[in-house]
């Protein structure tokens, strides 16, 4: 009896940790996919300029008919080596 309760406790603990981990990964993945798209007929250069003023850059889709602005920052990468003195 004691071993069954122990196994159930470990199973519940594993399920809880797995759920938290998966929710964290899903949130991280979705945070880099936030785009606001406007159906504008402007050049790609104008799209980039307009998006740079209000967000973290833009991209043209459908040959410039759709302008999408990125609303979340790109990932940051840091060099693990300290700067040389």
From Swiss-Prot:
Disulfide bonds join 37-69, 44-60, 47-67, 51-68. The keyword Transport does not apply. It comes from the Eukaryota. Keywords: Antimicrobial, Disulfide bond, Fungicide, Plant defense, Secreted, Signal. Coiled coil: none annotated. Residues 1-31 form the signal peptide. GO terms for cellular component: extracellular region. GO terms for biological process: defense response to fungus; killing of cells of another organism. Its main location: secreted. It is found in: Secreted. Belongs to the DEFL family. This is Putative defensin-like protein 79. It comes from Arabidopsis thaliana.
């Amino acid at each position: 009896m004691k071993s069954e309760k122990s196994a159930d406790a470990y199973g519940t603990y594993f399920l809880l940790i797995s759920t938290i981990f998966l929710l964290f990964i899903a949130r991280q993945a979705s945070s880099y996919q936030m785009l606001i798209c406007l159906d504008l007929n402007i050049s790609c250069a104008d799209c980039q300029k307009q998006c740079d003023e209000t967000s973290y850059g833009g991209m043209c889709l459908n040959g410039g008919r759709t302008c999408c602005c990125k609303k979340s920052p790109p990932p940051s990468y840091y060099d693990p080596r300290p700067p040389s003195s």
